[in-house]
Regions:
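Extracytoplasmic/secreted cell-surface and envelope-processing proteins
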Residues: 38-40, 64-66, 103-105
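A short helix->loop->beta-strand "cap" motif at the edges of active sites that frequently abuts
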Residues: 51-52, 89
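Short, flexible/disordered intra-domain loops and linkers
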Residues: 63-75
């Protein structure tokens, strides 16, 4: 049975990191991931993902903050999506209404649902 890993915020970033570490996860749901984290952009440029499917999401107001590091979230999620696509990963990026703290359970559920839909009917447990 295919495994899916996912999470919200820092757990979303961990899920993305895991996608670069192992092929044990056929799909990853990185919901509002902390891609603004120091050197994450450098890391993804130097590594290849090992998963087949990645769901990304971000609130459309998350970059509207006084914190200069958090303001980079929108640009970095776009760069993350582009990098995954360049590497041949089936990737979607969904923009949600609101900031980082709105509807996190529903957003995460949508991510796992998307992953399950991508894996429906696939028999091999690893990519």
């Amino acid at each position: 049975m295919p495994c899916v890993l996912g999470g919200y915020s820092l757990a979303g970033l961990f899920s993305l990191w895991a996608a670069y570490q192992t092929n044990a996860f056929r799909a990853v749901a990185a919901c509002s991931p902390s891609v603004w984290f120091d050197d994450w952009d450098t890391y993804i440029a130097a590594h290849e993902p090992k998963t087949s499917h990645v769901y990304l999401s971000l609130g459309n107001k998350e970059h509207k903050t006084r914190n200069p590091l958090l303001r980079t979230g929108k640009a970095r999620i776009l760069a993350q999506a582009e990098r995954l696509t360049q590497c041949g990963v089936n990737t979607t990026l969904e923009w949600n209404s609101g900031n980082h703290f709105q509807d996190n359970a529903a957003r995460t559920a949508k991510g796992f649902l998307w992953c399950a839909e991508q894996l429906a009917g696939q028999e091999k447990p690893y990519a």
